[in-house]
């Protein structure tokens, strides 16, 4: 089952897959303030109903683990570092965990990292424009996730260090009054 807490900010390139739990939990109300939605979904019917309700027309399945990269540790590490780089998307990011575990980190209004530890049956919806990052857990080193999309699947990350603000980012910042 999901855990939400403030990140301890003690991560490095060598240990970012560890849990980094500060001991300060985060409530669902705190997540709602930044537009993050969490659901616990145990059946395909529930997932399909959510997709219909939120007008998600497309989906795919992604598997992240070393075998998915033909056991090429360099390619695997490069992808994990890419996902862990702080970024946002112009569309909602919807992930349903089917297998394994992963961490999604999102920024709160004070620019602190909130960490979500996701396991099977956890679904997370991140609003367009929110800064976030992802990594596998050190324990599992594997995740199989269903990605849901309103339109055709696209995945363009806009890294924070570029300083680029699109309409999606500006709208998100206004929505949460940052």
UniProtKB/Swiss-Prot annotation:
A cellular-component GO term for this protein: nucleus
Pfam annotation, one family: ARD
BP-aspect Gene Ontology terms: L-methionine salvage from methylthioadenosine; methionine metabolic process
One annotated GO molecular function: acireductone dioxygenase [iron(II)-requiring] activity
Subcellular location: Cytoplasm; Nucleus
Catalytic activity: 1,2-dihydroxy-5-(methylsulfanyl)pent-1-en-3-one + O2 = 4-methylsulfanyl-2-oxobutanoate + formate + 2 H(+); 1,2-dihydroxy-5-(methylsulfanyl)pent-1-en-3-one + O2 = 3-(methylsulfanyl)propanoate + CO + formate + 2 H(+)
Pathway: Amino-acid biosynthesis; L-methionine biosynthesis via salvage pathway; L-methionine from S-methyl-5-thio-alpha-D-ribose 1-phosphate: step 5/6
Residues annotated as signal peptide: none
Name of the protein this chain belongs to: Acireductone dioxygenase
Species the sequence originates in: Candida albicans (strain SC5314 / ATCC MYA-2876) (Yeast)
Gene: ADI1
